[in-house]
From Swiss-Prot:
ATP binds at residues 72-76, 220, 232. Belongs to the CDC6/cdc18 family. It comes from the Archaea. This is ORC1-type DNA replication protein. Keywords: ATP-binding, DNA replication, DNA-binding, Nucleotide-binding. GO terms for biological process: DNA replication. The gene is cdc6.
Amino acid sequence: MSEGEQLHLDKLFERLLKARKIFKNKEVLRHSYTPKDLPHRHEQIEALAQILVPVLKGETPSNIFVYGKTGTGKTVTVKFVTEELKKVSQKYNIPVEVIYINCEIVDTHYRVLANIVNHFKDETGIEVPLVGWPTDEVYAKLKQVIDMKERFVIIVLDEIDKLVKKSGDEVLYSLTRINTELKRAKVSVIGISNDLKFKEYLDPRVLSSLSEEEVVFPPYDANQLKDILTQRAEEAFYPGVLEEGVIPLCAALAAREHGDARKALDLLRVAGEIAEREGASKVTEKHVWRAQEKIEQDMMEEVIKTLPLQSKVLLYAIVLLDENGDLPANTGEVYSVYRELCEYLDLEPLTQRRISDLINELDMLGIINAKVVSKGRYGRTKEIRLNVTPYKIRNVFRYDYAIQPLLTVSLKGGQRRLL
């Protein structure tokens, strides 16, 4: 490296720092940020506050079930209200503990109980390992640490449907009945879900206990999303860096996806990041469209990355057919290549009927298009095409050790046999 090149690199960060600043505080646009005011959620704030106010009178509040689609403000509103409750409770010398658990990550009965116990470890000196103890022993410790003094403990289970679908409702049964086993403390549960249907998985006794009170969050419309983005933008960006059409466009695009405020915030943040990296003086509508494309690509890559192994092998069979010029293909043609790939990996193949189900799942995820077409007297068949480029799929699979061995495989030209 020459001296001039080294000097250029040394000055790199200084040069980037001196570029036109777009963001004043980017964190304001993150999902984890709790603003001082929540536009268009005052009705839900009031409802939650009415249910929780008994705490300030020394009474046990009802359990609450909160539901609504993704990006409707459920989590941020619950955090906002419980933080306000904690502030006011301190004024009245009423001990309140709020324990927030994301059940997409903490998704087993054992881990939920362990997280609650470990919330109090600084106070109690008791810590439960994330694996290894009998569950009933962890539950006994939970009761012990909670009941060490008089207090109200509010347990927020976010994405509660993920927990129930994976591990059943036993933990909910325990937590919604724990007050009968406590002498000093009182526990209330707030369950948050994107999926109302998950209640079908619950034992009727658990459902009646959890759903003592319900608060519904409807989707935002485009105008409401504009208000939310305008409020956040004032804190997030320097004055004058957003072109006039940027916020309305972000709001309109997010409103198309069931009024998802998270999507709207992501669009605005990523558009700002793209403008900043380009050294642009303003964030424009073009930056928003590019942000939309990037977010969709990132989401699709994440979907492909988290597919089960059999679905990945099936998808790679479709990739090979595409690269061989054999798409659209029917289910039988795809299945033939899929079986060969399974043999190559020493993997037990699924039945053609099950593969037909997986093709439908890939279609629903938007990774492929599986259109049923009529062949006249030959009946109906599926025509399968890719919606994602083979390059992008291969790029995701490059980092997947289970599927990596297939990346050197191709089909013989004009034949559907592996090379």
